[in-house]
Amino acid sequence: MTDTTLRHRTARVERVTKESSIVVELDLDGTGRTDISTGVPFYDHMLTALGAHASFDLSVRAEGDIQIEAHHTVEDTAIVFGQALGKALGDKAGIRRFGDAFIPMDETLAHAAVDVSGRPYCVHTGEPEHLLHAVIPGSPVRGTGEPGAPYSTVLNRHVFESIALNARIALHVRVLYGRDQHHVTEAEFKAVARALRAAVEFDPRVSGVPSTKGTL
């Protein structure tokens, strides 16, 4: 049995490019406290939901070229979150490794499954076709009153792929049914959050890394 009494798995990752500047701080053993600022209000809402429902303490500070569009900032933030997740997991000793969750939101039902395998892969399926073209308007950014960038729901797949590839996890996200672009997207993020929560939590019956290979 792994002694996890005093262990907090944390990471801080910073990434700066010509398109964005991102800092993510993550505590996998938190209580769901979040402090998110990306300049894309709907994305802030989704990352807040992810942190809260995964019970991660999550801080995100992102500045990007949102005057062009939100794509770079959204994708780069997901990359850095994935890197922080992988770093915080460390050697993965004592974790459950697998997790999945169904999340209903009004007319929508979404499902996510995670394997903290060290083999990055993402499957994203089932979104209604109109989400390829849907845009959620940007509300005023909290604390500034300035208009935030709109969020195109075609970015959902980019987010989940970026998290999976950079955290080195297998992540499957599917929408069983749904219509409203807000509900579909939020159900997906919450399903991913709950699946991650289950996968990264400690299993008192597991000693060492949960793999017959001895490493993940």
From Swiss-Prot:
InterPro entries: IGPD_sf, ImidazoleglycerolP_deHydtase, ImidazoleglycerP_deHydtase_CS, Ribosomal_Su5_D2-typ_SF. One of its GO terms (molecular function) is imidazoleglycerol-phosphate dehydratase activity. Pathway: Amino-acid biosynthesis; L-histidine biosynthesis; L-histidine from 5-phospho-alpha-D-ribose 1-diphosphate: step 6/9. Its EC number is 4.2.1.19. The keyword Phosphoprotein does not apply. Keywords: Amino-acid biosynthesis, Cytoplasm, Histidine biosynthesis, Lyase. It catalyses: D-erythro-1-(imidazol-4-yl)glycerol 3-phosphate = 3-(imidazol-4-yl)-2-oxopropyl phosphate + H2O. It is an enzyme of class 4 (lyase). Belongs to the imidazoleglycerol-phosphate dehydratase family. This is Imidazoleglycerol-phosphate dehydratase. It comes from Nocardia farcinica (strain IFM 10152).
